[in-house]
């Protein structure tokens, strides 16, 4: 499907009843071709989506609410365009269902069909809302480095290694900003880079991250671009790149890519989320 046909950036009426046809898949392969990524990926990963505005009607017409976390595997053929996902979830608002399991069954079936692979789903009931925590990404934050920046489109040539022996460290920043490729709206994120290898020059990394500031690309694609650029520039033996983007339309998206870790960290939202 062409992005020109996606609901993002268009005036679309909110649905009144359940409609799985609202989901708009976008092939991952299209963007990955520009990153020189083929069928064999240099990483594993997931895209963690948190839905904060999930509601439906029970069999007697009484509203129910919950939150949910969806895990889209990075090797699925498609991502789902975010506005279409929001509209799809909102199509349950006036839909009667016998129980929460019926909702779960529809979500799992429909999202797997759109993504082209099984999608993990975790429900969070109102009884558990009080258990939810908030925390910042761990790591050494590089935001206070005293540097001058004048590049605001992705510039992988900025990346470089620093002198020194091999290290194992985690670096983090709250200064990642990219833009929606359809609407131009800003996308804000915290970024974590965990690696083992030659030291990454921290000032160079910060300049590189900031260079995304006027770049238009989906969240998932930005993280894969960052992963590939760091691998080519510094060739770490181990690398994980993880971004937590702020919420839009009741959804936040948190892509995680790694060539050595088997599972992402706990899905804990940051203060800005």
Curated annotation (Swiss-Prot):
Glycoprotein as UniProt keyword: no
Pfam families the UniProt entry points to: QueF (PF14489), QueF_N (PF14819)
Main location: cytoplasm
Annotated localization: Cytoplasm
Listed GO biological process terms: queuosine biosynthetic process; tRNA modification
Record's keyword terms, sorted: Cytoplasm, NADP, Oxidoreductase, Queuosine biosynthesis
Residues at the catalytic site: 180, 187
UniProt protein name: NADPH-dependent 7-cyano-7-deazaguanine reductase
